[in-house]
Design a protein with these regions (language model features):
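N-terminal auxiliary segments of SAM/dcSAM-dependent transferases
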Residues: 1-58
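Conserved Class I S-adenosyl-L-methionine
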Residues: 13-14, 246-301
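Class I SAM-dependent methyltransferase Rossmann-like catalytic core
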Residues: 57-80
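Class I SAM-dependent methyltransferase SAM/SAH-binding core
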Residues: 107-161
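A short acidic, Gly/Pro-enriched loop at the edge of an enzyme's catalytic core
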Residues: 160-171
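A short SAM/SAH-binding and catalytic strip from SAM-dependent methyltransferases
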Residues: 169-183, 204
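A short glycine-rich, Lys/Arg-flanked "PGG" loop and its adjoining helix->strand segment in the class I
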Residues: 181-199
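Conserved class I S-adenosyl-L-methionine
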Residues: 199-232
Length: 301
């Protein structure tokens, strides 16, 4: 009998690849092993380190992920989560129906998943298989511990060498994280609806995201205003935009939660939060844009 923490990796040979030789990884007792005998143990918490020695940024410490988790679980990003679920659901819907019953599971990859908030939501709300990775071991420890269903394949992995087989993913989700479009195109496969290509759902900050904190710290920032145009242009160079959705909400917020936001947001990395009069901030705007697209075989025509 396969232990619960191992069961989610039973079909690893269909999706996971060795980071050293890129061949398929197969579950053998409590480890993932490739044909060349490279072996990666499954941690008791339920994740696998497919990276080696972690080189995470000091900005993304265990404490920063705990702060992020507190904010996410408080509901401030629920409107973003719901939009992501809708976008992934639309990618999934063409494959539903009697013809898909015995087909390969619809697989979603959460790239740069952090503490796993979105990956867990996708797995809990949609009938899909979820693989999620992050460069941070601390993040994966937290993600795996909060995965009560023991259903997501959690990996410590590198965006420049995603430990996933070519063409094994139907939908890549990238929420407020860096992108590697060449790797995304490599892992994406046509969906189960004939020749329909795989889908990328990339979530980026909107122009009004955290505008209250931006105004408070404007004297210390390179730019008083934010635009995601460069990110959007790069997206469209590699993926054909099929949808673009903006979601925004402004929340009244306690001084404690404002301080947690200030500590966790990359906007204020390198700025001494103690130098800011955070008590002036009574509300914070959470605005995101979802860029949804399919891979371009070449540059835009």
């Amino acid at each position: 009998m396969v232990l619960d923490r191992y069961a989610r990796f039973a079909d690893s040979a269909d999706v996971l690849s060795c980071p050293l030789c890129h061949s398929a990884l197969k579950l053998q007792e409590g480890s993932l092993v490739c044909p060349k005998r490279h072996c990666f143990d499954i941690a008791k918490q339920g994740y696998v380190n497919l990276l080696g020695p972690s080189r995470q940024s000091a900005h993304y410490s265990k404490e920063s992920f705990e702060s992020r988790m507190a904010i996410l679980e408080a509901g401030y990003y629920d409107h973003v989560k719901e939009a992501v679920l809708t976008a992934v659901g639309r990618a999934l819907s063409p494959s539903e129906g009697p013809a898909a019953v015995n087909a390969t599971p619809f697989r979603v990859l959460d790239a740069g998943c952090g503490e796993g908030f979105y990956a867990r939501a996708i797995r809990e709300n949609l009938c899909v298989d979820v693989v999620a990775f992050d460069l941070s071991k601390d993040a994966m420890l937290m993600a795996a511990r909060h995965d009560s269903r023991k259903a997501v394949k959690w990996l410590v992995g590198d965006l420049t060498n995603i430990p996933v087989l070519k063409g094994s993913i139907n939908c890549v989700v990238d929420v407020f994280a860096p992108s590697n479009y060449d790797e995304f195109k490599r892992v994406l496969t046509p969906t189960r609806n004939a020749s329909a290509p795989g889908v990328l759902v990339k979530v980026v900050p909107g122009s009004n995201h955290l505008t209250e904190l931006r105004h408070l710290a404007e004297g210390s920032l390179r730019s008083k205003e934010y635009s995601n145009q460069l990110v959007t242009d790069c997206f469209e160079k590699h993926f054909k935009m099929t949808d673009r959705i903006k979601v925004t909400r402004t929340f009244e917020m306690s001084e404690r939660d404002v301080r947690v936001f200030a500590e966790m947001t990359p906007l204020l990395f390198g700025i001494d939060a103690e130098s800011l009069i955070l008590s002036r901030v009574k509300s914070i705007t959470i605005e995101a844009e979802l860029l949804v697209g399919t891979p371009r075989s070449q540059g835009p025509s």
